[in-house]
């Protein structure tokens, strides 16, 4: 099921990155290719780092790494070279893996690793766009730090920082407001029983045996 879901996400991501241009040209093709390249290399990088640290390769890690690559390359897909997409994929696979590991050690309640994969990956992608962007692959874009424009890099970092602050403040505020009317977090006993059974009185998968 996880593999099927990841495949659907991957396919849908073409709409994010390539389809959002609303036409077919060289930039569309670049975004399409970069999406595949970054996701593939991120999956391999995550798998290898997990293998080194945990002594066993895990299929779930491979899939999570692919999603990390997709999330990270999204800001940059139409503005960088395929070679840069390889770098973005490898860096995102490694960095997001350790972000998730940090989350686990700190025991944050993030069952889907949204912070470590999408949050850290998105921040990383915006920052790397500021470093690697080039007009060679998208004349309508800008040149990044490595191509002689430190101003664009600073703009991207500033945008990433303020977006992170905005997301944290308003998410926290909304959760506090919601918590006034209903419990945001379920109890540990409900989690142990399973939310399908504890909240809805039924199991989604009856074939599962305790």
Segments predicted by a language model, with ranges:
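Glycine- and aromatic-enriched membrane alpha-helices
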Residues: 1-210
């Amino acid at each position: 099921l996880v593999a099927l879901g990841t495949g659907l996400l991957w396919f849908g991501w073409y709409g994010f990155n390539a389809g959002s241009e609303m036409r077919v040209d060289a930039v569309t093709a670049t975004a399409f290719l970069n999406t595949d390249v970054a996701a593939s290399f991120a999956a391999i990088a995550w798998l290898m780092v997990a293998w080194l640290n945990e002594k066993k390769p895990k299929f779930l890690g491979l899939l999570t790494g692919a999603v990390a690559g997709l999330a990270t390359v999204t800001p940059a897909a139409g503005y960088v070279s395929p070679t840069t997409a390889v770098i973005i994929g490898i860096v995102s696979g490694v960095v997001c893996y350790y972000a998730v590991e940090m989350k686990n050690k700190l025991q944050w309640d993030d069952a889907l690793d949204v912070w470590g994969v999408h949050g850290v990956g998105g921040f990383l992608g915006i920052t790397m766009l500021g470093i690697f962007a080039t007009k060679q692959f998208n004349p309508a874009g800008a040149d990044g730090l490595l191509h002689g424009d430190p101003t664009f890099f600073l703009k991207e970092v500033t945008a990433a920082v303020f977006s992170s602050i905005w997301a944290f403040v308003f998410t926290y505020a909304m959760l506090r407001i919601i918590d006034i009317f209903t419990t945001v977090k379920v109890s540990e006993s409900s989690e142990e029983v399973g939310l399908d059974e504890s909240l809805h009185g039924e199991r989604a998968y009856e074939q599962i045996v305790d």
